[in-house]
Amino acid sequence: MSISRRKTLALLGGGFVVAAGGAGAGFLSTRTPTSALEAWSAAGRYDDPRMNALSYAILAPNPHNRQPWIADLSRPDTVTLYVDTNRLLPHTDPFSRQIVIGLGCFLEVLSLAAGQQGFRVDIDLFPDGSDDSALDDKPVAVIGFEPSEQAAEPKLFAQIPDRRSLKEPFDTSRQVSQSAIDALLATVTRGSHAATTNEADSVAKLRDLTAKALEIEFETPRTYKESVDLFRIGKSEVEANPDGIDFSGPMWEALHLTGLFSRKAAMDRDGFTYRSGLDMVRDTARTGMAYVWLISDTNSRYDQIVAGRDWVRVNLVATELGLGVQPMSQALQEYPEMSDLYADVHQMLASQGQTV
């Protein structure tokens, strides 16, 4: 038996949506993609501990919500994880570094969910080898389940259903306290190096760098189109394909119905939709109040998995603390147009030979 993404075995899911009511809702108030949200309510309802763990793991963050995982359950007490090579991001993520980080997030959430059930997972990464330049059909991980009373991390586990990546400007009236920063650093235990800043000058530099990186991704036609092709606009599209970049809820439904928001409009570089979208992402980047980043000694597949495991732990602790978190990793992307900012961010945040 194998399961793939959030749309199989009743593990249906996509982006998290809250539909707004109020005057004029009518048709639009019915536009919540209910079946695409079932993954959250179905989590933890299985007799097989592997299925239970997987029902939480599919809620893990992953780039562009591609959900590139395939889980094979044919061996007893074992999950074999593969990557779906049809769900990669060849333009923004040409070496699939971000995809592998997302698989690391998946493995960490699976581990937390298994621990909550009284199981320890033994994870054998890339048992048949790996290629740092491309992904293939070899196993990403073989995961064995063993009973254990020592594996649970209940505080982190409790945050899994509520964890989100913030997609709106940060509250610039709220400072991020040093105690919160210390808590984020303390949860990085899987092997990455972690650093943070809430110091004004450093924050200003990172705001500027992330805004420039978003602008490059937006204004490079092939990388921008890669995102636009993954837009899921309105309830019917989210229900049909509960992956990608979610634009559902009354506002987006209304804009779509009136023709003000569509893939065609988004691709018109001289149009309102394109220009306002660029302004929105750039302005959001310039509201960050503190930054946390993870550093690896190499850029190997192993280190990418570890970074993903540590990243989702940071995201879960931030959720517990009531902090909004958004990955601003565009400057870390490895396509030619981003090379100058890639060099800048590594000079700013990493030592020689390390990878942010």
Regions from the PLM with identified roles:
Residues 2-356:
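Acidic, surface-exposed loops and disordered segments
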